Amino acid sequence: MDTENRSRADLALPNPQESSSAPDIELLEASPAKAAPPKQTWRTFLKKELEFLGATQILVGLICLCFGTIVCSVLYVSDFDEEVLLLYKLGYPFWGAVLFVLSGFLSIISERKNTLYLVRGSLGANIVSSIAAGTGIAMLILNLTNNFAYMNNCKNVTEDDGCFVASFTTELVLMMLFLTILAFCSAVLFTIYRIGQELESKKVPDDRLYEELNVYSPIYSELEDKGETSSPVDS
């Protein structure tokens, strides 16, 4: 019994008024979790390539303008068959080049300054440029079919200026077709990106409104609970 009482006496309960000799435990603030890396989507990929798309359109426009200038300065368009030089008589290498250069220039400027009027202007210019490029592709394909049909008739002809012009312009038309397809893809991709950006900017205020409602809803519920608990006491 004595040993049991001694063992109980040795067990001293801690006094809350006495300062504990044990070292204070430092409370470490939980470091905030690292933000997850942004999800890679087609829009993030296009955002990195916007200036490249604009530069592509400018380059395509300048090359088409050079081709049109060379043909119109070397050849008299009115002296040859209309089917062979249909593209140049309609002036596509000139007005198409102007639209490509303009849309490419606005694309680069709007990406660097990112103001509202430049963004809207670049969007409209690229829509017009994509329509012009689609029209140009149809015209180029039609011109190629006319050239191939004309060159088939040149097999039995030894010397003919029209056949030489047809073979020369066919090579230029093929290169312009490739460049126009490239400009069309650039304009369409830029247009899709800008339209997606416009739609996302319209959704942001609604999302913020829902976030504010979610933040304030616990406060409102707490006030309602306090009002319900205080009403029986008042009665």
From Swiss-Prot:
InterPro entries: CD20-like (IPR007237), MS4A (IPR030417). It is found in: Membrane. GO terms for biological process: cell surface receptor signaling pathway; immune response; signal transduction. It is a multi-pass membrane protein. Residues 72-89, 143-171 are extracellular. One of its GO terms (molecular function) is IgE binding. It comes from the Eukaryota. Phosphorylated on tyrosine residues by LYN. GO terms for cellular component: external side of plasma membrane; Fc-epsilon receptor I complex; membrane raft; plasma membrane. The keyword Repressor does not apply. The modification Phosphoserine is found at S217. The modification Phosphotyrosine is found at Y210, Y216, Y220. The chain crosses the membrane at residues 52-71, 90-109, 123-142, 172-191. It holds the Pfam family CD20. Keywords: Disulfide bond, IgE-binding protein, Membrane, Phosphoprotein, Receptor, Transmembrane, Transmembrane helix. Residues 1-23 are annotated as: Disordered. Residues 1-51, 110-122, 192-235 are cytoplasmic. Belongs to the MS4A family. Tetramer of an alpha chain, a beta chain, and two disulfide linked gamma chains. Binds LILRB1. Interacts with FGR. Interacts with FGR and FES/FPS. Interacts with LYN. High affinity receptor that binds to the Fc region of immunoglobulins epsilon. Aggregation of FCER1 by multivalent antigens is required for the full mast cell response, including the release of preformed mediators (such as histamine) by degranulation and de novo production of lipid mediators and cytokines. Also mediates the secretion of important lymphokines. Binding of allergen to receptor-bound IgE leads to cell activation and the release of mediators responsible for the manifestations of allergy. This is High affinity immunoglobulin epsilon receptor subunit beta. The gene is Ms4a2.
